[in-house]
Amino acid sequence: MPPSQTPAQGSGRFLLLSPPSLSSHPEKLNAILGLHARESTDLQMLDRLALGLVSLPESTYDVVLLLTGADNTLAETYRLVSRGVLQGVVNSLKPGGKLRNRDNQIWGSGSDSAAGLGSSDGDGGGGEKMSSSEQAFRNEAILAGLVFDDRGELAKPDFGAQQAVPLKLGRKKNLGESAFGNGAVELPASNGVRVTTGATSSTTTTTTTTAAAAAATAATPTTTTTTTINSSTPSGVGFIDFSDDFGVPMVEETQDSDEELIDEEELLGEYDMGRHIVQPPECRPKAGKRRRACKDCTCGLSQKLEAEDRAKRANADKALETLKLRTNDLAEVDFTVQGKVGSCGNCALGDAFRCDGCPYIGLPAFKPGEEVRLLNNDVQL
């Protein structure tokens, strides 16, 4: 099918994924947009989607269309569609939605597929030999959850509505009455030991017999062991001794055994650590309001807020460094000099009556003319 043609599209909501090279040719992009209803068609750039700058809504689109680049090939598209991008595209498809390309040459309902000239593997591909990038894209699409339908198109499977199915468990009726008539229940025999529990009796009798003795008389047991049980035991209840090891020694594992411990750091590779964190829309900060991070934050908002707090704290500590006074900034006050009083003349009355420049600020009230001395940092009047 020539690149200028586009297969007929059905009704529904469409998503067009355009490579960045197509944005430099607006005439081609406008021609493609003109083939679809604008009110039911969305356009996204693959490079923005790959960088995590935009996110796709879930279960919204009926058809996702991959556009070819400016060179009319899908090479640029395959290079940008990574595993994470493809998983987001699959999540945005409705159940039964289709993933198509513009020309339907690699998959889809092209003329080769419709005529039954697909590849020998029967997966709906075209008759031409696929390149490594095309085959890798098909494999990633299958791993993301897409399947090939009867027409050879990549589709999201529709599993239908899930509902709970009640399960009715069968129950044997009158098991004890049919066996003994008195409500007693016989447990399965093991190693020639038969265990019988009585409904009204307060004892459980364990009897071991041989085949010859049983044929001679059923009333003469070889060995009889009687264990007293609480009289409140309900009918038809048996007891199992879980402490019995049946002759097999039990090996206790040491507490310091770390054979089954898994290092979580080994589960993430360099590719996973370098991937861009996609922040959910509800965690994105709004203008004029600072959003608090969740307790188990995994989108990176908690680390971002902690980094901002550390930067603010560092700037505040730098601005509030210890104030160092130079010699010119110091002033010496000698209280022994006679006649040195404030301009208000109320120095002896106390701080409440002294002016701002009074040399006696901080000293208690004293009598006018009284000598003031300082001994061991204490005021002596």
From Swiss-Prot:
Annotated region Fe-S binding site A: the residues are 283-299
Instruction: State the GO CC annotations.
Output: mitochondrial intermembrane space
* Major subcellular location class: cytoplasm
Annotated motif Cx2C motif 1, positions = 344-347
Q: Specify where the region named Disordered lies, as residue ranges.
A: 100-134
Q: Which family does it belong to?
A: Belongs to the anamorsin family.
Q: Would you tell me the protein name for this molecule?
A: Fe-S cluster assembly protein DRE2
Identify the species of origin: Paracoccidioides brasiliensis (strain Pb18)
